[in-house]
């Protein structure tokens, strides 16, 4: 539900956006991961939509840094700092990482979601940023919307939707 004066900012594949209240950040995920940063006291947030855990060539991440967890998450941290939020003022929620390629005879494709989840968790732990909530794995894609007025996330998955209110 849009509140007065708010607008939806879509976060595309291999993309990142930062905004403040009353904006809404939204993305749709399959095996990709949506990383949601939110600073409740400042009503500022950022969201990245990355596709893969690491750049196997080490070259593509220079052109497409939000395609990979290893470059997207540090850039999210930098974006939060640029918007005036220091570590300790924000927390993180993680979404996506579904197994979307069942029946495909490729272990790489079958494990993309799982690898994305594990890599994102490891980078967040190394960065000492609290991961307070996640809805990851499974076989269903998701659409997530971060409402920057209060930090709630609307999660749509498997024909159902629910609001997640945990922000600290």
UniProtKB/Swiss-Prot annotation:
Recorded hits in PANTHER family, A to Z, give:
CHEMORECEPTOR GLUTAMINE DEAMIDASE CHED-RELATED
Tell me which CDD domains the record gives: CheD (cd16352)
GO terms for biological process? chemotaxis
- Tell me the protein family, please: Belongs to the CheD family.
MF terms in GO: protein-glutamine glutaminase activity
- What is the protein name for this chain? Probable chemoreceptor glutamine deamidase CheD 2
Organism in which the protein naturally occurs: Leptospira interrogans serogroup Icterohaemorrhagiae serovar Lai (strain 56601)
The enzyme's main class, written as a single word, is hydrolase
Q: Which reaction does it catalyse?
A: L-glutaminyl-[protein] + H2O = L-glutamyl-[protein] + NH4(+)
HAMAP family hit by this protein? CheD
> Keywords, A to Z?
Chemotaxis, Hydrolase
Please give the function described in this protein's UniProt entry: Probably deamidates glutamine residues to glutamate on methyl-accepting chemotaxis receptors (MCPs), playing an important role in chemotaxis.
> SUPFAM superfamilies of this UniProt entry?
CNF1/YfiH-like putative cysteine hydrolases
EC number(s) per entry: 3.5.1.44
């Amino acid at each position: 539900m849009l509140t007065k004066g708010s607008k939806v900012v879509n976060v595309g594949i291999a993309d990142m956006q930062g905004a403040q209240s009353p904006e809404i950040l939204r993305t749709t995920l399959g095996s990709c991961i949506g990383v949601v940063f939110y600073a409740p006291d400042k009503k500022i947030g950022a969201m990245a939509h990355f596709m893969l855990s690491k750049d196997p060539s080490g070259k593509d991440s220079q052109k497409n840094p939000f395609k990979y967890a290893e470059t997207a998450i540090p850039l999210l941290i930098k974006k939060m700092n640029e918007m005036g939020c220091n570590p300790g003022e924000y927390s993180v929620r993680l979404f996506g990482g579904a197994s979307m390629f069942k029946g495909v005879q490729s272990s790489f494709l079958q494990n993309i979601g799982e690898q994305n989840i594990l890599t994102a968790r490891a980078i967040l732990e190394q960065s000492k940023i609290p991961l307070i909530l996640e809805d990851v794995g499974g076989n269903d894609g998701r659409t997530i919307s971060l409402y920057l007025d209060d930090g709630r996330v609307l999660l749509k998955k498997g024909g159902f939707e629910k609001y997640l209110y945990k922000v600290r």
